[in-house]
Amino acid sequence: PGLSGDPISLRGYGAIRNMGLAACAVLGHDVAVFLDDDEVVLDEDFLLDATYGLGMETRQGLSIYAKSGYFIDREDSPFAAMDGPRLRDRFWAKREEFNEWMHRALSATRISRSNSICGGCFAITAEAYASVAFDPTITRGEDLDYLLNLRMLGLDVWFDNKWHVRHLPPEMPSRAARFLQDVYRWEYELAKLDRANATIGMHQVRPESLRPYPAIWFSPEVHARIALTALMRVIFGPERLAYLRILLV
């Protein structure tokens, strides 16, 4: 996709979140809290939990300027379903590494360093949002991308294992269209990290610092995963013509 886009807009994942940050800045708010329209608050103390720990320091003297909660599904589980992936999804599944990371985060202290962001359960202080914006050109995963943006400028995201919402995602009209967005997303992220890591003054973000999840998605291995998944879905899945077009791009 082209790399143009309005930084603040009502279209595009990153631009919409920047709209929220801009509104908070104009109104002089110290904290911005994000809740998506497909998520449900389960606790009347949601906003109290959102601000828990913000502005404080860890025992190592690291400031907590941004933190993420997590979501549970309809069955009250925070983990990805562990049913064996279909053959056509073998190279695109990320359940095991995500669940490994989630197990660690949930069994740690309440506030721990995060490898991920749940954009619909996310809080950030003015100290961070006044310096770091969401990337308006990202096609999907603007929340995880924001973690990279923060790390590039020397800021961390923290995980609060006592703060969560329920995620009720809508039906997906086309898996192929979503896959194409992910293809653009991961290819863009690789190029972005390469450029940032070679830029003087930027903090380097290495895939190994994101183990067990989402490390492999920020490594060159993702190129093969894209090609193999598209090929498998051309052979075995629905929307074969759409996947063939993606494979041939």
Model-derived segments and spans:
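Short beta-strand-to-loop element that shapes/binds the nucleotide-sugar donor at the catalytic cleft/hinge
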Residues: G61-P85
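Acidic donor-binding loop at a coil-to-helix junction in glycosyltransferase catalytic cores
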Residues: T139-Y146
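A recurrent flexible, glycine/aromatic-enriched loop bordering the glycosyltransferase active site
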Residues: H103-F122
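Active-site-proximal specificity loops/subdomain of glycosyltransferases
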Residues: P1-A23, L27
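Short beta-strand-to-loop acidic/aromatic patch adjacent to the donor-nucleotide binding site
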Residues: H29-L42
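Active-site donor/metal-binding and catalytic loop motifs
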Residues: L153-D156, D160-A177
